[in-house]
Amino acid sequence: MSTVVTIPRSVSWKGDAIAVLNQTKLPHSTEYKTLTTIEEVWKSIVMLEVRGAPAIGIVAAFGLALASKKYTTLHIEEFQKKFNRDCNYLGTSRPTAVNLFWAIDRMRESIQEITTIKEAQKILEEEALRIQQEDEAVCRSIGEHALTCFKDGDNILTICNAGSIATARYGTALAPFYIGKEKGVRLHAYACETRPVLQGGRLTTWELKQAGIDVTLITDNTAAHAIQTKEINAIIVGADRIVANGDTANKIGTMNLAILAKYFDIPFYVAAPLSTFDITKQTGAEIVIEERDETEVTKIFGKQVAPVGTTVYNPAFDVTPNKLITGIITEKGIICGDYKREIVSLFEKTS
């Protein structure tokens, strides 16, 4: 029997504005912030009000559609110049999230043949909506494929938030929990809190509880003990960038879990859409890793917890080598084994 599941959304298009779920306010309050300029979109991405690679791509696409509406009186050449400037500007917001650049490129390519600004504005709005709609379908498909990896009653560990609020809907790593709930397959999530800004503790627990899905929160340094004592059956994570050989950039701490999975001999899955793949890069060594402000580590909710002046290293992501990954779950199926060959083959089939 199917069950209706409450699945929150993070981005909505209002025609002349974008409404984003302000994820920095969760779980204490559910606030939607209205964005009306390209600068507000950029800041919202940088400040993690909207986050998750697919959601970042979606809000960037809407941001470009929104910005185009302010250029109605320009000549077409000047419009193109300002639009390209906006594309480059948004690209500086989160350099590791490949979906951001994928969405920007799609928006840029969609108006290559336009002859009027009115035509461009219409096409850009339609393309942004299409990106959002496609992502929802893609995430559901990822969830369907991922669910085949698990059985009723499984305990599954995850990190950060690769859920509905990080995408158009359903999420990637959390998609099988939603699809499982719909189909009566009970999956229990163990969520790492995910320092330094606690996306697991604040966001994953919040959205799964909204849907009535069992979730247990653990500190990041409890992961090994939890696997050892709580009968964790598998680990599933999202991705911010996957390169041609399968090396995967995701939230800092992901590689720790992959190493633990190898040691304890449990499956380690990556769930991501094809738009998260960057096959222009051959190995993870080529991925640019964003480093964030030291205050994310030295302060917790505004309170200083380390001596002032302490040196901080705060990378937002790490890169998990392909040899630690059991399978990469995409909307087209599950890739495993020879990742380089399988990824090339997958993109040849979809091109």
From Swiss-Prot:
Enzyme Commission designation: 5.3.1.23
Pathway: Amino-acid biosynthesis; L-methionine biosynthesis via salvage pathway; L-methionine from S-methyl-5-thio-alpha-D-ribose 1-phosphate: step 1/6
Keywords, in A-Z order: Amino-acid biosynthesis, Isomerase, Methionine biosynthesis
InterPro entries, per the entry: IF-2B-related (IPR000649), IF-M1Pi (IPR005251), IF_2B-like_C (IPR042529), Initiation_fac_2B_a/b/d (IPR011559), M1Pi_N (IPR027363), NagB/RpiA_transferase-like (IPR037171)
Pfam family, one: IF-2B
GO BP terms: L-methionine salvage from methylthioadenosine
SUPFAM superfamilies: NagB/RpiA/CoA transferase-like
Function comment: Catalyzes the interconversion of methylthioribose-1-phosphate (MTR-1-P) into methylthioribulose-1-phosphate (MTRu-1-P).
Assembly: Homodimer.
Protein name (database record): Methylthioribose-1-phosphate isomerase
Organism expressing this protein natively: Bacillus thuringiensis subsp. konkukian (strain 97-27)
